[in-house]
Amino acid sequence: MRGMWLLAVLLLAGCQHVAAPPPIGGQIRDLHSGQVLTAQQLLARLAEPDRVIVGEQHDNADHHAAQLWLLQSLGELRPQGSLLLEMLTPDQQAKVTAVRQSVSPPSDLSGALAWQEGWDWKLYGPIVRFALTQPYPLLAANLDNGEIRAFYRNPPVLSGERSNAEAVKTILLGQIGDSHCGLLPDSQMPAMLA
């Protein structure tokens, strides 16, 4: 009888699923507290909010591998509503929809999506390929280049009690600079507020 209990415990333990850690070295650190997190702690924290914004250093392969791991792992913990990518513009959305509706993926997926050369397909391709196989929508989250240039040339006038306050602009400029690792030229910063 004791052997049966041991066997049952071992079988049940084998059914427990724990996401594998991200396929990269280094530490996961909470930038607000400095606390080092395990992969499981990170997933537990990110599974709670309705929306998660994930960024990367655009040319860092480890960041992209971690993003793919995170997308796959969160999908096992909770339903995903959608995936929005800064790399996709509204004029590409119909192409994304066509690829999703096709019976088999095109041999040249980046070409079928009219993927922009500025976003290295070798790094972003695995994330896009995975997202296209999921039940949730893959959506464009950027503006077309013409729209961006129009905002830069003629920024809209914002209304609201605090929208134009210098303190708010200073905070927003700081966040924009931080989210781009301090790599944006100062001359581009004011236009980013548009």
Give the role of each language-model region.
Residues 47-57, 107-111:
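Acidic/histidine-rich, surface-exposed loop or edge segments in extracytoplasmic proteins
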Residues 82, 94-194:
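A substrate-binding/cap region within the structured catalytic cores of diverse enzymes
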Residues 35, 39, 59-67, 93, ...:
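Solvent-exposed, acidic/flexible segments
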Residues 55-57, 85-88, 141-144:
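Active-site-proximal beta-strand/loop segments in catalytic clefts of secreted hydrolases
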Residues 60-65, 69-86, 90-100:
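Membrane-embedded segments
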Residues 25, 49, 78, 134-135:
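Short, well-ordered alpha-helix to beta-strand connector turns
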Residues 4-14:
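Bacterial N-terminal signal peptides
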Residues 14-49:
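N- or domain-start disorder-to-order transition segments that initiate the globular core
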